[in-house]
Curated annotation (Swiss-Prot):
The lineage of its organism: Bacteria, Bacillati, Bacillota, Bacilli, Lactobacillales. This is Large ribosomal subunit protein uL15. Residues 1-13 have a biased composition (Basic and acidic residues). GO terms for cellular component: cytosolic large ribosomal subunit. It comes from the Bacteria. Gene3D superfamilies: 3.100.10.10.
Length: 146
């Protein structure tokens, strides 16, 4: 067997339907577009969401809310994520990035109280929840908001 002798399996490939190539093909003359009208013309499609002149659904629905351009998004770190660090070590944004806990460059890092902290740490983050601060201090560590 040679490379030039390779053929696809029978029935696995189908020939493309070539329209407008003579009346005996079954798809000659109008090429499956019907008679006259918008859809028989080139470029004869309606825009997305067009409902024939009826008020489209997206305009019938009421507007809701807005996008706050000043919103800051923080990378979320939970207490159980901090258990991987050594006892007594200092946790900064740089150490969180190098350990892979923070991947995106956002407005900062926020510490939340999900899970249980078992090691004593000095945590330096941009924001911290009240419960997370109490949990870090209960474990013997400190929290510094930078």
């Amino acid at each position: 067997m040679k490379l030039n002798e390779l053929k696809p399996n029978e029935g696995s490939r189908r020939n493309r339907k070539r329209v407008g190539r003579g009346t005996s093909s079954g798809y000659g003359k109008t090429a499956g577009r019907g008679q006259k009208g918008q859809l028989a013309r080139t470029g004869g499609k309606t825009r997305l969401g067009f409902e024939g002149g009826q008020m489209p659904l997206f305009r019938r629905m009421p507007k809701r809310g807005f996008k706050n351009v000043n919103r800051k998004e923080y990378a979320i770190i939970n207490l159980n994520d901090l258990n991987r660090f050594d006892d007594g070590s200092e946790v900064t944004i740089d150490t969180l990035k190098s350990s892979g806990l923070v991947k995106k460059e956002l407005a900062g890092v926020k510490l939340l109280a999900n899970g249980e902290l078992k090691v004593k740490l000095t945590v330096k983050v941009n924001k911290v929840s009240e419960a997370a601060k109490k949990a870090v201090e209960a474990a013997g560590g400190t929290v510094e908001v930078i």
